[in-house]
C-alpha cells in the first residue's frame, strides 16, 4: 500500500475511514494492534478470540497505520459489488455467523456508533426488513432488498 491508496477514495470516504480508524485506535498511538481490536469488539458487546484477531492483523504487511488501514479496505472493496460490501458490514455484527442480528442490538449500534442514525431512519429500515418472531433481522435478505429493491422470490 503506497500513497496512491488515497486515490481509491473521495475526500468524504477518507474522512469516514479516518474516523473509524481513530475509534478503533483506542490507545491513540497511530496504529491498530491486537489490544485495540479487542477493545473495539468489547465496546460493541462482542467477544473475539485472539486467533481471529491475529488472522485479521496478518492481512497487513506490518503495523497497521492509517495508510495501511485504508489500503486494506481498498483491497477488500475493489472488485466487490455493493451487496457483498453491505453483507460484510453486517457480518461483523454477527459473531455467531447465523445470518441474523437481533434488531434491538442493531438499532442500538446504528443509533450510537459512527454515523448515528435517527430512530426514524432505523424504523424505516426495519419496515422493509425480514424480522422473525424472536426479533432477529435476516440481514442477507435485507442486503438483497437494499441492492435490488425487493425480496428474492
UniProtKB/Swiss-Prot annotation:
Keywords: Calcium, Metal-binding, Motor protein, Muscle protein, Myosin, Repeat. The keyword Repeat applies. Ca(2+) binds at residues 25, 27, 29, 36. SMART domains: EFh (SM00054). InterPro entries: EF-hand-dom_pair, EF_Hand_1_Ca_BS, EF_hand_dom, Myosin_RLC. PROSITE patterns: EF_HAND_1, EF_HAND_2. Residues 12-47, 81-116, 117-152 form the EF-hand domain. One of its GO terms (cellular component) is myosin complex. One of its GO terms (molecular function) is calcium ion binding. The keyword Calcium applies. In molluscan muscle, calcium regulation is associated with myosin rather than with actin. Muscle myosin contains two types of light chains: the catalytic light chain, essential for ATPase activity, and the regulatory light chain, a calcium-binding protein responsible for Ca(2+) dependent binding and Ca(2+) dependent Mg-ATPase activity. This chain binds calcium. This is Myosin regulatory light chain, smooth muscle. It comes from Halocynthia roretzi. The lineage of its organism: Eukaryota, Metazoa, Chordata, Tunicata, Ascidiacea.
Amino acid at each position: 500500500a503506497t500513497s496512491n491508496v488515497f486515490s481509491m477514495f473521495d475526500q468524504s470516504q477518507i474522512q469516514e475511514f479516518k474516523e473509524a480508524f481513530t475509534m478503533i485506535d483506542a490507545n491513540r498511538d497511530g496504529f491498530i494492534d491486537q489490544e485495540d481490536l479487542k477493545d473495539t469488539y468489547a465496546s460493541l458487546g462482542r467477544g473475539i478470540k485472539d486467533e481471529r484477531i491475529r488472522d485479521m492483523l496478518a492481512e497487513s504487511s506490518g503495523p497497521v497505520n492509517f495508510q495501511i488501514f485504508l489500503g486494506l479496505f481498498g483491497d477488500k472493496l475493489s472488485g466487490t459489488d455493493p451487496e457483498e460490501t453491505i453483507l460484510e458490514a453486517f457480518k461483523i455484527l454477527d459473531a455467531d455467523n447465523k445470518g441474523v442480528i437481533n434488531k434491538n442490538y442493531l438499532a442500538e449500534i446504528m443509533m450510537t456508533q459512527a454515523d448515528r442514525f435517527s430512530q426514524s431512519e432505523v424504523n424505516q429500515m426495519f419496515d422493509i426488513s425480514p424480522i422473525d418472531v424472536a426479533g432477529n433481522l435476516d440481514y442477507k435478505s435485507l442486503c438483497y432488498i437494499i441492492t435490488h429493491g425487493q425480496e428474492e422470490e
